[in-house]
Amino acid sequence: MAETDVGSVKGKEKGSGKRWILLIGAIAAVLLAVVVAVFLNTQNSSISEFTGKICNCRQAEQQKYIGIVEDCCCDYETVNRLNTEVLNPLLQDLVKTPFYRYFKVKLWCDCPFWPDDGMCRLRDCSVCECPESEFPEVFKKPLSQYNPVCQEGKPQATVDRTLDTRAFRGWTVTDNPWTSDDETDNDEMTYVNLRLNPERYTGYIGPSARRIWEAIYSENCPKHTSEGSCQEEKILYKLVSGLHSSISVHIASDYLLDEATNLWGQNLTLLYDRVLRYPDRVQNLYFTFLFVLRAVTKAEDYLGEAEYETGNVIEDLKTKSLVKQVVSDPKTKAACPVPFDEAKLWKGQRGPELKQQLEKQFRNISAIMDCVGCEKCRLWGKLQILGLGTALKILFTVNGEDNLRHNLELQRNEVIALMNLLHRLSESVKYVHDMSPAAERIAGGHASSGNSFWQRIVTSIAQSKAVSGKRS
């Protein structure tokens, strides 16, 4: 009887030992899976997903978006209301008009910083410019017979060059000191229909994509991190960060969920991971929106009287009416008369020096757009950087309202880029405002799921110890 009891005890100990081995093995497998998932997620970062870690900038503490937008003259609640009720509907209609639908751009690569990106490397590099005989006659100047386009990534990154028969009236050609890629009529420029090439996910990933944002941020982030930085030195970082956030928002809002079935939709997890979880990125998005809005409203007289002729009289009159509504809306003027106060900048002895420094840095960022290896990313990058450069030109190049009325000259392409950029930012602000609760619920659900899983593991271990203790 005693031997039987001893054997029974030994059998129980062996059974308990096996359970512990299985439990430890399961935990090890889970940990390995987590490490692999994190590694793969890191490897899959794209141009829209790069978080600017090179900057090591201090992240703001979590807070709700209430009160005045930092360095601006409007509060979040007013911005959201005006954007939803007034600006966004007007801008949606405006960018669909013939004048604002077409953008002239140099699409082929001419990277001045790293020569290896000037060559096609991936499987979708075969997109080429059409022969001259295939171009619509409305083009102001013919393109060269053959120009290979540098293209990286996937088919969804390809620019659709389809145009309809619209004519353009040329505007004054002037130099923009803030950009390196001015509107110059030459064989490298082509018109692109922006409605056929929406800003969305393209599959542009890897070292080339990460290097773009690293190069952009390295031009200005060190100026921002210093505790003693003045407001002028922080502006460029905030503008770039806000634009970066907007790009990420558009990719998350129109994402390729299933490549096999070509299923597109919202990726709210990406929205949270790349934008919402970092309050400073949301704040900088609002800052950039108000900065560009200030430039548009400051140029009210110029934009309101400009010619928007494309050969379609009805559409052209509609365009002019929409522009006037955007730049002089009474609700906007009453609630947010000065979205951003540029008059307080460039004061003191260092003012001119800081301004020249900012111009040089932004020109470098503008030149980096030629290094983008994804054709659609390059298109929207060039358009939005030109739009931001135009806003800087309006606010900082011509001093005073009187001088602005007499001395401001904008290229047609600058006006197209400026209004399309304002629309992109408006869409991003609206999407963040509308979808933040849902995205945060999803993120919270994932966190709760993870916590519940690990809690089950800990509970299982505790229960095993308790059972083992009772059996011993």
From Swiss-Prot:
Residues listed as glycosylation sites in the UniProt record: 44, 267, 364
PTM info: N-glycosylated.
Swiss-Prot/TrEMBL cofactor(s): FAD
GO cellular component term of the entry, any: endoplasmic reticulum membrane
Pfam families in UniProt: ERO1 (PF04137)
Positions with a binding annotation for FAD: 200, 202, 213, 241, 244, 274, 281
Protein localization: Endoplasmic reticulum membrane
Catalytic activity, EC: 1.8.4.-
Residues annotated as signal peptide: 1-37
Keyword Oxidoreductase: yes
EC class of the enzyme, as a word: oxidoreductase
Membrane topology (UniProt): Peripheral membrane protein
GO molecular function: FAD binding; protein-disulfide reductase activity; thiol oxidase activity
Disulfide links within the chain: 55-74, 57-72, 111-371, 120-125, 221-230, 374-377
Keywords carried by this UniProt record: Disulfide bond, Electron transport, Endoplasmic reticulum, FAD, Flavoprotein, Glycoprotein, Membrane, Oxidoreductase, Redox-active center, Signal, Transport
Biological process per Gene Ontology, one example term: protein folding in endoplasmic reticulum
Segments traversing the membrane: none
PANTHER family registered for this protein in UniProt: ERO1-LIKE PROTEIN (PTHR12613:SF0), ERO1-RELATED (PTHR12613)
Family: Belongs to the EROs family.
Subunit comment: May function both as a monomer and a homodimer.
Function in brief: Essential oxidoreductase that oxidizes proteins in the endoplasmic reticulum to produce disulfide bonds. Acts by oxidizing directly PDI isomerase through a direct disulfide exchange. Does not act as a direct oxidant of folding substrate, but relies on PDI to transfer oxidizing equivalent. Does not oxidize all PDI related proteins, suggesting that it can discriminate between PDI and related proteins. Its reoxidation probably involves electron transfer to molecular oxygen via FAD. Acts independently of glutathione.
UniProt protein name: Endoplasmic reticulum oxidoreductin-2
Gene this protein is translated from: AERO2
